[in-house]
């Protein structure tokens, strides 16, 4: 969906080196009347893409930006295969089923040796969450109907730190979203408060394994225990879904004793992003259910499209096969040992970056030691400059780092967040620390900050009052100003 209006008065693209092949201009918003040489088309597009950021330096995103050349070749060899043509590409379907079973076993699903796991591949965790939510809603409706109770007011309980896809699910499928508010120094869902919000209309409680804001793991074990007590008292049978989009490929390798998955009886489904720490390019996610009974059969479509019965549970139909194949490549290429080594290296680099940021003496570290390998940090003193200003200044070095405020009840906290992926080395961490220090030195003497302090001093001659006013203005006025200023360049928290 395009919401932008034409801001460029010039409605045509003018080729640079492509003028060797063609001199005609290319319309921006209409299909051209005539064809052009393939070399020229490539050059026109390539020239425009030069202004995109460097994916390797995009530290806002969890999404994988590098894979081995052998896997790149597999992807290109299968890029023309439509995944839904299962009868025509049976081996591709088999590879997906193998991936589902590998993930289910990794998450301790109670699957027998001769039993197939229940799950499917998706285009990402957003689709996976939609599917899991639909399954919960339908199961809740069945229970309510059997008891002769109304089914018109379903709700779901989450923390205020959930990714936007949960809000989409609630809005698209008419489910009330009940959010547990955050507080300063506690930026994840409180299990006790979540269980307090559960009522007879709650279709599930969503726990996050790896908050997008701070990388922290929510306490799924405590949530399970508290919910078990409430279910025993009320007979409601409220289940848990674990959104492990970021942490699902972290916890099994770094924290194997942490109980967050199907080892907990009230966890009924889990989603995970293959294109994050599953180490595959963008376009693949997974959802697995505890047992066959947790996915209502009526939601599974059996389609005889090209000569064979195709059971499918998806919001999409046609999609590429290459990411599924790439996921299988990573599983057999790396194995448990390989994934463990990569995740340990990511965490080591995160610690290195964290130590360097702490040594500046300018920041408070908001992220935790246990969780997704990232570093989230806020300024100790926002009276002279803001995190939005720092993020904007780091752009000149090529770094893409998001700055954002926390959700409701903690929105006065503004942070920077650096995601550590496999392709982020210790050398890059050291270089980023150097650039952060350089930016801090540069912006401390900016005229705009000096003018702001002078304006605050003019309000009152009392030094202590000036400090209070300056701090207040930093939190309320300066933050708002910089947010507006860089809004068009900021990255969505993903």
From Swiss-Prot:
N6-(pyridoxal phosphate)lysine PTM positions: 276
The keyword Lyase belongs to this UniProt entry's keyword annotation: yes
UniProt xrefs under InterPro entries: Glutamate_decarboxylase (IPR010107), PyrdxlP-dep_de-COase (IPR002129), PyrdxlP-dep_Trfase (IPR015424), PyrdxlP-dep_Trfase_major (IPR015421)
GO function term, MF aspect, one: pyridoxal phosphate binding
Cofactor section: pyridoxal 5'-phosphate
CDD domains assigned to the protein according to its UniProt record, in alphabetical order: DOPA_deC_like
Database matches in SUPFAM superfamilies: PLP-dependent transferases (SSF53383)
Tissue: Expressed in flowers.
Entry annotated with the keyword Lyase: yes
Record GO cellular component, one term: plasmodesma
Entry keywords, A to Z: Calmodulin-binding, Decarboxylase, Lyase, Pyridoxal phosphate
Enzyme class: lyase
Disulphide bond pairs: none
Listed GO biological process terms: glutamate metabolic process
EC number of this enzyme: 4.1.1.15
NCBIfam families the UniProt entry points to: Glu-decarb-GAD
Family of the protein in this entry: Belongs to the group II decarboxylase family.
Quaternary data: Homohexamer. Interacts with calmodulin.
Free-text function comment from the UniProt entry: Catalyzes the production of GABA. The calmodulin-binding is calcium-dependent and it is proposed that this may, directly or indirectly, form a calcium regulated control of GABA biosynthesis.
Protein name according to UniProt: Glutamate decarboxylase 5
Source species of the chain: Arabidopsis thaliana
Gene that encodes it: GAD5
């Amino acid at each position: 969906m395009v919401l932008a209006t034409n801001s460029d008065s010039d409605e045509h693209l003018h080729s640079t080196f492509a003028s060797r092949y063609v001199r005609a201009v290319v319309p921006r918003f209409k299909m051209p009347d005539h064809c052009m040489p393939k070399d020229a088309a490539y050059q026109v597009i390539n020239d425009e893409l030069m202004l995109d950021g460097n994916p390797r330096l995009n530290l806002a995103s969890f999404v994988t930006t590098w894979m081995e050349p052998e896997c790149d070749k597999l992807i290109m060899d299968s890029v023309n295969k439509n995944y839904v043509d299962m009868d025509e590409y049976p081996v591709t379907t088999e590879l997906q089923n193998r991936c589902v079973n590998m993930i289910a076993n990794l998450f301790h699903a109670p699957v027998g040796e001769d039993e197939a796991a229940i799950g499917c591949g998706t285009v990402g965790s957003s689709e996976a969450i939609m599917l899991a939510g639909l399954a919960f809603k339908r199961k809740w409706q069945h229970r309510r109907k059997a008891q002769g109770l109304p089914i018109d007011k379903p709700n779901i309980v989450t923390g205020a730190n959930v990714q936007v896809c949960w809000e989409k699910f609630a809005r698209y499928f008419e489910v009330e979203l009940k959010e547990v508010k955050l507080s300063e120094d506690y930026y994840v869902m409180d299990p006790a408060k979540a269980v307090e919000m559960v009522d007879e209309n709650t279709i599930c409680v969503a726990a996050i394994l790896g908050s997008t804001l701070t990388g922290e793991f929510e306490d799924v074990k405590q949530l399970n225990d508290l919910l078990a007590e409430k279910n025993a008292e009320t007979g409601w049978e409220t289940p848990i879904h674990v959104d492990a989009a970021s942490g699902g490929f972290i916890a099994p390798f770094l924290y194997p004793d942490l109980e967050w998955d199907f080892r907990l009886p009230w966890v009924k489904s889990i989603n995970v992003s293959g294109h994050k720490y599953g180490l595959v390019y963008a376009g693949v996610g997974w959802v697995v259910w505890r047992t066959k009974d947790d996915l209502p059969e009526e939601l599974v479509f059996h389609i005889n499209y090209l000569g064979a019965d195709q059971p499918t549970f998806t919001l999409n139909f046609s999609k590429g096969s290459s990411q599924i194949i790439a996921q299988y490549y990573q599983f057999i290429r790396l194995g448990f040992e390989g994934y463990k080594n990569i995740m340990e290296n990511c965490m080591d680099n995160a610690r290195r970056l964290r130590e360097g940021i702490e040594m500046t003496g300018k920041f408070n570290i908001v992220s935790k030691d246990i969780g997704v390998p990232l570093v989230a940090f806020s300024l100790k003193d926002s009276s002279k400059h803001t995190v939005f200003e720092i993020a904007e200044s780091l752009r000149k070095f090529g770094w893409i780092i998001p700055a954002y405020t926390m959700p409701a009840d903690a929105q006065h906290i503004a942070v920077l967040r650096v995601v550590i992926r496999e392709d982020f080395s210790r050398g890059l961490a050291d270089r980023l620390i150097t650039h952060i220090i350089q930016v801090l030195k540069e912006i401390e003497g900016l005229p705009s900050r000096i003018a702001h302090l002078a304006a605050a001093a003019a309000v009152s001659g009392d030094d202590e009052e000036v400090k209070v006013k300056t701090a207040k203005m930093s939190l309320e006025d300066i933050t708002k100003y910089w947010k507006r200023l860089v809004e068009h360049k900021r990255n969505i928290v993903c």
